[in-house]
Each structure stands twice: as C-alpha cells, then as structure tokens.
Amino acid sequence: MIRDRAGRDIRVLIAWLAGIAAGALLIGLIMAPPVIGLADSGDFGRVLGVSGLRVLHPDQSYEELYFNYAHQYFGYGGYTLGGYVSTHVVFVAIAGWIGRLLDGDVFDVRVLGACYAAAYIWAVVLFVRHSPGMKSRTATTIMAAVLAAVLLFVFGDIGYEAYFQSFFGEPYALIAMLLMVASAFALASSNEPAGRLFALFVVAALAVATSKIQNAPLGLVFALLAWRMTGLRRDPRWRRQVWTGAAILLIGSILMIAAAPDRLKHVNLYQSIFFGVLKDTPHLERDMEELGIASKYAPLAGTNYFQKDTAIPQNDPVLHREVLQRLSHKDIVLYYLKHLSRFMQKLDRAAENAMYIRPYYLGNYDASAGKPPGAISHTFSGWSDFKVAAMPRSAAGYFLVFIAYALALAAVWRKNRSGKWRVAVETMAVVALAGAFSCVVPLIGDGEADLGKHLFMFNVCFDMMVVSVIAGAFYGAIKLAGRQVRNRRNG
C-alpha cells in the first residue's frame, strides 16, 4: 500500500529528498560566503589544544577574539592534555585530521561544519525513512513530507546550524540526541530490528551522556531505554546485543561522572553557591549560616567564579578549604528541597532564558565579511524567532506543557499494546525527562552562570517534543480522514 509500482517504499524517496534539502539548506545558510559560525566566548580553548588545533591570530583584541566575530580559520598545533572531559574532543580531532588532509596550513571551520552536517542529514533521513506508514501511498507520502518539513524548519534553523561551525560542545550533543532518537524510532518501526541500528543507538546515546559531565546521569536513563528494546526481537543474539549495549551505557555514564576533575567540581560548586543559592537571596545571613559558610564570605554573594576584582579571590586557598572542599552539590540539593520557593525562583530565572536557542551576544560572521562587530544572521530563523516571541517566560508555563505532554504519552502508551509502539512512546518520554533534567541540573550544578547556553539541551528536547506533537497531530488527522473516506464509500 505504501510502495510504488516498482515495489519501492515511497518513504525512502522522500527521505533522500529531505536529506538533499537539509544539505542544500546547510550549504546555503552557513557554508557559502559569508561563512556563519559562533564567536568563542572563551570556551574553545579547552577543546582546541586537546584536538590538535589552535587560534590562528591570538593577537586580536579580547572583544574581537571572543565576542565580536566568529572565526573561519584556525591553525594546527600539537596535542595537549587538559581538564576537559568529553568525547566531543574526539569528534573535533577527527575533523582536524580531515582538515589536515585538505589543507595542511590552516583549518577551515567548514570542515567541522561538514562533519556535523553529515550526521544531521543522516538523522533527518532516518527519521523520515521510518516515519509512520499509513494505509495508502498518498497518506504515507503526506505523513513523511510533513515530518521532513517540520524537522528542517525546527532543527534547520540558523540558531542551531550556526553552532555547527564552532567548537562548542552543544552541536555534538544535538546531533547525538537526534541520531539516538531517530535510531530508536527506526528500531521500533522495523519488523526485524538490525544490530547495526542498535549499535548506532548505543553510540549516539553514549555520545550524549559523555558530551559533558552534566549530561552523564542521562546515560542511566538511556541504558534503561536500551533494556526496554529487548522485546523487539526474540532471538538470544539480540538479547545479548541489548544487554551489552545497556551495560556500555551504564558503565560509560558512571565513568564519566567519576572522571570529573576536582578543579571543575570546585568551579561549578562556587557557581552553585555564590551565583546560585546566595544570588539575590532575601535572607543572606540565614542561608549562609544554614550552609555553614562564614559571614566573611558574604561579599562573594552574587559573584561568579570568573569575575575579576572580587573581595576575596576565587582561588583563595582558605576559601577552598573552608567552603569548596567542605560542601558538595548534595548540600545544594538539600537546601533547595528545604526551600522550594527559592528553587521555584531559580526555575523562573531559567524559564526567562529557556527559549533562546543561541546566545545573541556572540557574533556570527568572520571579520572578513565586513559586518559590524557582534552582527548575527537572521536568515531562516523563523523557529528561533518564534520561540523568543511566543514561548512561556515562567516555570509554571513550562510545567503545564510538560504535564500535558506526559499525560498524552501515557494515554498513547495505554492505548497501544504493541511493544514496538510502546518503545517509541517511551523514547519520547525519555526525551521529555532529559529536557526537564537539562533545566534543573544547570541550576544545581552551576547556578545562574551562562544559563542561556547551559539550557541548550533543554531547547533540543523541547523542540523534539514539539516535532512529535505536530507529527502526531498529522498522523491522527490523516487516519481520521482516511476512516471518513472509507465510511463514505461503504455507506
């Protein structure tokens, strides 16, 4: 019913067309001159040295180097060891090796962009190829085309794609999340799920969990989702593959958590305390006393770890001994559990930043493009602009959205007894859980520091939820229309 006269699944053709459209969109938006990327903001250094790359012109002014302009070209250097723990550096290093083959003098950031683009196109093709099959070829075509259009409109937005030509870890997590969910849907929709598809799911899920230390706990949930795939096939080989994959995710997540450097823990803890709990508190003395922090550190309330000219230097050994080595993030969690109203205030603060896919304070253009300092591109920014204009600005608004989504998933799960359907629904439940997790963890783990960028994964998960709602609505509408047509014919 969903095949053409040559016996080909129409979704294959639409998937390839969607992949071609995604590639053309990427080339036109970020690779064709003027090249689009994101300015550094000071984060690239922890990735470049480990990946064998370096800044090509370090003599630029601070604003030019980190905020005003993205940079198209970088230099090559030796490989250094650093405290940045992430599999993201492996991806960047591979792009660096490809870059050396193409041009041994300078690294063009478009090589990295092309690597991300290839993975993004793969995800789009997987999603569309395994879109829901309908009873007629026309209905299947419409369903696949709608899904392709929504995926390109949302995740092809310049807000996401500008990240591809930067050394931030965000695009790595985005691509991994898309591939993880796409492969999960592909597995759930297959009559005989392939081991290579499950391997892709495991690799992508592990990439998300190891993209940054804050995402590591997600690997535990991904392992549970992998285990739920045991019933997709009944043979012993499949069960061994699933159990092995779940174990890899479990162990990888635990190792990622254990690998967090002490210095990074102390930086994040400082942010959680002084730029989180104690920031804007109406009861500073009480909160400091409850946490066991001496009153002499009161001037640090509201400061971040990288701020200059604080009353007490952030690297002061006494501060480390009396505060950062004595407290832990467990104390932060306990504080917020005792003072839920304070945590709600922090969630409202997060909600004020939750709709921003990209940081608007970072320039998108290389200086050679002749654009004003800090200029950003608004080409194909319909989705990101809509979010800024229309998304909730309070935690209560997002609570309602997530509760409604959870209830809808529960209803679909109960209605469908098929194990394959339930795995697909559970995949989206994991996405929603990851979104909620990605909103809460930055507040506990890093206070209000750089909230806009730290909520990137929240945006990814929220937008995947939106795509699933739109696709689900069209699926229901097409089924209803088909039923009405059949009833008229039979009547």
Task: Locate each region found by the language model.
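Hydrophobic transmembrane helix bundles of membrane-integrated enzymes that assemble
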Residues: 1-33, 88-278, 389-481
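Non-catalytic effector/regulatory segments
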Residues: 9-40, 280-309, 316-317, 378-390
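Extracytoplasmic loop-helix module adjacent to an early transmembrane segment
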Residues: 24-100
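Alpha-helical transmembrane segments of integral membrane proteins, especially early/N-terminal helices
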Residues: 42, 75-78, 134-141, 354-363, ...
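Membrane-proximal stem/loop segments at transmembrane-domain junctions that anchor or position
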Residues: 48-80, 261-371
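Individual transmembrane alpha-helix segments
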Residues: 68-115, 318-332, 336, 385-394
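Membrane-proximal, non-transmembrane alpha-helical segments
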Residues: 337, 342, 346-414, 421-425, ...
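Membrane-proximal cytoplasmic C-terminal regulatory module of class A 7TM GPCRs
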Residues: 482-489
